[in-house]
Amino acid sequence: MRPWGSIKLDIYGGSHEKRMGLTMELPKGLRLDGEIISRDIERRRGVNKKGVTSRREADVPIYISGVRGGVTTGDTLRVEFENSDFRPKDYTDISSLPRPSHCDYPAYIKYGGIPSGGGIFSGRMTLPLVFAGAVARQLLMQRGMTVGGHYYDIGGALDSPFHPLQVDRHTLDRLRGSDFPVLDVSARRAMEDRIGEAAERGDSVGGSVELCALGLPVGTGGPLWEGLESSIASIMYAVPGVKGVEFGAGFRMADMHGSDANDGIRIKDGKIAFESNNSGGINGGMANGAPVLLRVAFRPTPSITQPQHTVNLRELQNARITVGGRHDSCIALRGLAAAEAALCLGILNCMEGL
């Protein structure tokens, strides 16, 4: 697998392997903030949250190289995590039955077998991604940038959206410290009900999260594939389960006129200001100074206990499958931490002078 981006991020291992990890290139002299890293890892774990897998791992980073005394040395940073609470036997009975809408069938054709527990395609692999994103978050914070987000839509239960132009750092910090990050606290009950109802039926629900980045210097990004949207989307789609990314008004723009979609520019208090933010803070692939806003859609967890149609790949016959094991009823819950990590990495990839 080719490394990603200017930091040459690489992730390796698998859900049911003893270890998995990452490598990335970082500047010399960065003091890694253990509290920031631990908080983001803990948010991804989602312990005691309704709809989250019962699999429990320590998720403690093991530093192999590239850091000494908590400070980066300038050499390649390599960090690993141990896996201990995995159960390959849960997949023995379905080793030749591809789970619908999972990686199993294309992986079987490409690699010659169905990877246990999803292998490197598993949501478990968001752990090293979240670690990398936490490091990226620190580098962005040093440059005055803040990233945060909230659950926007869980199974059709909606939270209030961010105001397109009036998002503040305090709100983003509050959301990051919440055990259930929503802007409207009354949305939590409805969201948890949707998750619980699906879980009782052996089913799952999809969801979306809304993300915001503040403080990006105007011009961050570039043309074509060097654009800010290109960078963010490319790493966002590396998060397992992500099926859609839209910036600003996104797909709603297809129903707009230019006179409605365009963000007027004015002078306010001696500074450039925008009358709206349908572009999500990005024009021409570059940050324009408004809040960078995007929404990320997660598919419903494909591993469900309801009987489904599949095929037996060894016998080439139609079959039915019931997926056991331990799985999230809504991957968007833990996916928020992974999406924030991807946003941090996508922005960092566009920063010059690292």
Regions found by a protein language model. Name each.
Residues M1-L354:
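Generic N-terminal targeting/processing segments that precede catalytic cores or assembly contacts
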